[in-house]
């Protein structure tokens, strides 16, 4: 599955009375990057073609260290999911300069015009070059001009177990994974961004009920005990808002069992 889930990776429908467990966790959702090597693994109905292949692409499980949205290192992503699009080169963007304050004296800068390049001068980043997409609980969109972009996704964490005063059953939801890749667009494209939601937590009430999974595919948990639901995956879709237009996916972590912590999402297997 391309999402975190409980009790099984990829579950996207509400759990039933026969699903869920008070004592066991489950796999997290797998990640995916659309490349020439992975295209054959795409489910039937894929709406993408070879012009959307990613380069320098990888998907990393949530039990491995990778770069966090803030730029630090994290081993698995906690909380809600996150997505980012960074402009590497955009053919239709105006030239700009950003001068570092450390330049104390007058300096001349020269640019070659009409060469379809975007320039930055100094160590600071141009604010418009990065688009960040935090969790909102709904789809977000952006329109990308022809150019080259770095795509990054962080999957959401699975829901925690509720201790109800017993520290032995305070299990932690599985952490989300990370996926990254570079895409070059030859024409203007609308993209659809889904930042997954963290799984929910259920207290031990003694009666069965459903704990809904996190936004964007987190599996639900049907239990009478204390357990969490799956975290949602984070993904970016190109051209149309369809599951079959996802070019990059970061898997969400699984929910907890009563006494078992959730499994990490992301990577090839989740």
Region spans (language model):
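Surface-exposed intrinsically disordered loops and tails
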Residues: 13-26, 35-73, 203-222
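Beta-strand-rich interaction surfaces with strong enrichment in secreted/lumenal proteins
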Residues: 131, 140, 168-170, 180-183
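Enriched but not universal
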Residues: 43-143
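Short, surface-exposed beta-strand/strand-loop-strand elements in extracellular ectodomains
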Residues: 160-174
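Surface-exposed loop/turn motifs at beta-strand-loop junctions within extracellular Ig-like
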Residues: 89, 155, 197-199
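Short beta-strand-to-coil "C-cap" segments at the C-terminal boundary of structured domains/repeats
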Residues: 34-36, 84-91, 182-184, 238-241
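Secretome/extracellular-domain signature
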Residues: 1-7, 173-270
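Extended extracellular/luminal ectodomain segments enriched in beta-structured repeat modules
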Residues: 144-150, 186-190
